[in-house]
Structures are given as C-alpha cells and as structure tokens.
Amino acid sequence: MAARLAEEWFAICGGCEVTILDIGEPLLDLLEKVQIVHMPVLMDHKLFGQTGENAEMEIPEADVGLISGGIRNEENKQLALEMRRKCKTLIALGSCACYGGIPALSNIYTTQEVLTKVYRESVSTEPDGFPCDEIPALTDRVYAVSEVVPVDMMLPGCPTTPEMVAGALTALLEGRSFPLATKSVCDECPTIREKKSVGTLKRRLEAPEFTPGRPLSEMRCLMEQGYLCLGPATRAGCGGSQGTPRCIRAYMTCEGCFGPLSEKANPMVDMMGALSTIGLDPKQIPDRSATFNRFAGAGRLRPAPRR
C-alpha cells in the first residue's frame, strides 16, 4: 500500500517545493510509493471543506508530513498543529521551516515596526491602513516549526537539495534513519587554507582569485582572500554526493543556508572565533547578529534595545 503524504507551506518563497520537482526521474519512482493526499501547491484541497461547511480546519491523515516555511501568522500555527496531529512522521523542509530562514530576519524588529515599514514607509507603497482584518493575525515573531510542534526530521537548505529530499523520503519508506551531517562546510571545502592574516574584508562584488578551468583544490580559501564566508559555522551537506559545497563550486562564499552545526551551536560565537584566526576584526561587519544568523534567526534574533 502506498504511503500517504501531506505537505503544507507557510512563510516561504516556494523554492523547496520546486526542489521536490527537481528530484527528476527518481521522483517517478517515489510517486509510485506515495499517495499525495494534501499539497496546496499542487492540488485544491479546502481546509474547511469544499464549500466551507466545516467549522474547523482539517487535513487528511498521512504517514508522512512535510512542512516548508516558518510560522509567521496564527493560521500557520494552527495548520502546524493540525499537521502534527494527522501525520505519523513530520519533516521540516528547508531552512525556513528548520530555523526561520530569511523571513526570521524580521525578528530584530517588533511586529508594529514591520507593519509600519511595509505598509506605510517603503518607497513604493501608497500609505494606507494595515490589512489586519483581511488576513490572519501575525504572530509576535517568526517561529521555526520545531518551536511550535515536535518535528521528527529536519532537511535544511535554502532551498534544500533534491538529493536530500529523495534520500530522506526513501529512507522513511524503507524504515531507515536519515542523519544530517555533523561536519562544517569548511570540512568539505577543498580549497587551500594557510591561516594567513587578512586584515580587511573585501566586498563580495570583488572577484576572488582563481584560475578558470583549474580544480578548486588549487584555489585559496575565500575567507583567507578576505571574503566573509560562513562555512566555519554552517552544517555541511549541501554538496550531496559531489561533496564540494554548492556555493564554493560557483566560486562564491558560503551564505550559511544549511544552518548551525548543531541545535545548541551559536553561529555568532563560532564565526567570531574563525575570524580571529585570520586576523579579521568582526567590527568590520555592520550587522553581526543578523549576518551570522541570516538563515537561523527564529530562536536567535530579537529586537535590539532602541537608543
């Protein structure tokens, strides 16, 4: 019998749903083993019945549930609770669901400050009232899914990788565990590290030094070239079977999208230590808290005291 699969998306761009499609041919094999019973991005399933006849939202029971996106409003929260009730195994899909992702950068502001900026003060907006009566009420901040309901598995990344999604679903169907990497991005980076002092950070628009066509193992570490790279404080795994991290393959620094090395890790502390080893002063970074927690702000970023 095919396993029943439900999926919901909250505060997210939709990239993790595209990742499911990007699984490619292996997705055809997976679809023979699962029955999709709820997935708003693909199918029209009304939460309160097809004609709105139900008083409470309802999601079909499922063996596996996927949630992408962080929890930003009260409807997201209620849906997360319903998914947890109806799904035997619940997976947080992507860094927004795992750690809050980019939307959680708003946690450094109060809800009122966010609404005022978006609906009254942005350059392209015609100032008007807040649409609080027409849309679900915002929560006080962006929450990771695991802060609201227990989660059985996390698949980080912005977006996560097709290989990881396929591997996790296959493992579940076969009754196997699917552990995340315990190493850092730096541990899987093939570039040359000499721990030489740098001194000054460079802008990302400046081109790093490398020889086109030559292997990455001949390129000097991007952070040692003076570019801010979050590899020391970021969980490995984005490279998949290729090993080499995705951003590094494109000659770009790690942005930190796979989140912290562990649940208790502090990316800001880890990055401070990494920067000090090559003589970089963290004070060169204007917004250190948000920069080092760019994808992991749900439980880490709060409004700063106003001066």
Q: How does the language model describe each region?
A:
Residues 69-71, 95:
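Short glycine-/small-residue-rich Rossmann-like dinucleotide-binding loops
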Residues 107-111:
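Short, hinge-like loop/turn segments at secondary-structure boundaries
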Residues 96-101:
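Short gly/pro/ser/thr-enriched loop/turn and capping motifs at secondary-structure boundaries
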Residues 77, 102-103:
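A short acidic (Asp/Glu
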Residues 1-66, 77, 81-89, 112-155, ...:
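Iron-sulfur (Fe-S) cluster-binding modules
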